[in-house]
Amino acid sequence: MEGGTNDGAAVPGNGAGTAGSIFWWLKNRCLGRGLCVDPARDNFRTMTSLYSSIHPADSVNLSTRTHGAVFNLEYSPDGSVLTVACEQTEVLLFDPVSSKHIKTLSEAHEDCVNNIRFLDNRMFATCSDDTTIALWDLRKLNSKVCTLHGHTSWVKNIEYDTNTRLLVTSGFDGNVIIWDTNRCTEDGCPHKKFFHTRFLMRMRLTPDCSKMLISTSSGYLLILHELDLTKSLEVGSYPILRARRTASTSDMTSTSSDTRPSSSPCHNSDLGPLFEKHMSRSSQREGASPRNSLEVLTPEVPGERDRGNCITSLQLHPKGWATLLRCSSNTDDQEWTCVYEFQEGAPVRQVSPRCSLRLTHYIEEANVGRGYIKELCFSPDGRMIASPYAYGIRLLGFDSQCKELVDCLPKEAGTLQVIRSLYSHKDVVLTTKFSPTHCQIASGCLSGRVTLYQPKF
């Protein structure tokens, strides 16, 4: 924790208590420490230590290379299947344990396949530049379960709320669309437009589905708090919780239409009435955030304070503690990977609340493969980050010991530590993914090769 305080030491005034005391036990329990909270924690710690011995193991090559670049990788929740989204309309399926090819969905879509999302161990969804989403069943891959129509431009990513069984998609048309998979038929699923913003790049849900994060090519990050997917958000129907130009300096909170940036991704509506609505609701609820309240941020990016940037990739910590961004400068001459901690709790002053995100760690990336989005990811326990780096990948940690984020939060933003660099491709790596169950990483590159990495002793 901050200041390098040991868990067992008594800290005056912070209520931590001494080792073995009830306050010490409660503090560690709140942080998720101890077998009574997370029985898998020690297992994940052991698995993380194995990544220091990881090497390229196999390449899942095919006899023909017609699928083009690899844009996305996704494991099934039980780790038994690895799916690959490809440039040339195809989806590939592999057994990640044996590295054997299972099947090729040769005409999964009519254009590039951008993203794959498993709904459970057998059902998965794919989205494409052909503006559609397709649902598939691993038990019957000869045909799609159904095709979903609703977007008007390239569909770029898919999220899924396991509690409500609602599918959430976003695309370059600026729309976030909700699909009710509970009432899915061969003709599709009932759907509705949930949100719209300009310059949309990526959309993600936090693990508990309490927040939606949206990144934009104009450098803005939108956060919908107290998320309710059952309500569509039309212009003026949601309160603006916070709107800030920066995430680390002065409280430049927009309180009227005069202070809104001209390139703001919000709707073309005056922010003044929306802020007044929010403030009145906030006073009634004693500072609690209203449902679907919107926060607009410009995340701090090292080296980019005086220039615009594009947030090309967006991921969430598996425990919901932080968000992971890959940013590139508007001139495409720099790329950064940044980690931002969620700062929860009611603000001290509602008229000038603190920002929800704080930059904790960052690292500069190799500036190769310009114009292509590089998809990075967290490990299943959130201790490590796998990030595409030129013709390989880098494993990054919050410190050299791969501690959890909550155990090594710095007072000021620090550099991510390179745990291991792995180079096994002959072209620019575009995507990487950790297996949810095995000590394995997969990566895919621009020329279509998929490589698996496993420990070797």
Curated annotation (Swiss-Prot):
Pfam families in the cross-refs: WD40
InterPro entries noted in UniProt: DCA10, WD40/YVTN_repeat-like_dom_sf, WD40_repeat_dom_sf, WD40_rpt
UniProt family annotation: Belongs to the WD repeat DCAF10 family.
Annotated region (Disordered), positions in chain: 246-304
Listed name of the protein: DDB1- and CUL4-associated factor 10
Biased segments, Low complexity type: 246-265
Pathway given in the UniProt record: Protein modification; protein ubiquitination
Function of the protein: May function as a substrate receptor for CUL4-DDB1 E3 ubiquitin-protein ligase complex.
Species the sequence originates in: Xenopus tropicalis
Gene Ontology BP annotations: protein ubiquitination
Keywords: Repeat, Ubl conjugation pathway, WD repeat
Gene name of this polypeptide: dcaf10
Annotated TM spans: none
Annotated Polar residues bias: 281-292
WD repeats: 65-104, 108-146, 150-189, 195-234, 306-346, 368-406, 424-457
Cellular compartments per GO CC: Cul4-RING E3 ubiquitin ligase complex
Gene3D superfamilies referenced in this protein's UniProt entry, alphabetically: YVTN repeat-like/Quinoprotein amine dehydrogenase
